[in-house]
Amino acid sequence: IPKSLLDINGKSILERQISLLKEYGINEIFVVTGYQREKYVLKDVEYLFNPKYSETEQLASMMVARKKICGDVLVIFGDIIFDDDILQQVLSSNDDIAVASDLDWEKSYEERSDNPRHLADKVLIEQKKVVQISAKEISLEPKNKVGEFLGIIKLSADGSKILTEK
């Protein structure tokens, strides 16, 4: 079963995300599918299929939706669980590209027995601007910060253009 369809107390992760988006008045929702796409049957959602899902990463799936990325857009990875305060912070940003990240991320990895820090998608922040998102280790200058990418990106109309033109 795709991770986004995992049931948690009677609701899938994706259903939880969609419910929260609707609470914020976001009703135009597109979901890019891949593995077991026939299992995605939620209503009021438009589905797009990434035929190369097994050989690509999330960015390629996002590019499947490239034509839908115009104007103000919110991109949420389908397999993440988040509090609505994180969504609220991202939505309230006036930046062209706002990325949800956890600057205290290393603490949560220290408490884990398997400690898979190397698997975390890291965000490099220079002067309050995101300049890189990478699963690789990021070299850090003293003035910069590194956070863990939380799988939520808000794009303004200009941010959408920047993303789709690159």
What are these regions (language model features)?
Residues 6-7, 11-73:
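Conserved N-terminal catalytic core of the sugar/cofactor nucleotidyltransferase
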Residues 10, 44, 79, 127-128:
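Residue-level detection of beta-strand-connecting loop/turn positions
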Residues 33, 77, 101:
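Short beta-strand/turn micro-motifs composed of small residues
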Residues 1:
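N-terminal nucleotide-binding beta1-loop-alpha1 segment
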Residues 36, 52, 80-81, 104:
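Short, glycine/serine-rich, charged loops/turns that create anion-binding
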Residues 84-165:
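Conserved core of the sugar-phosphate nucleotidyltransferase
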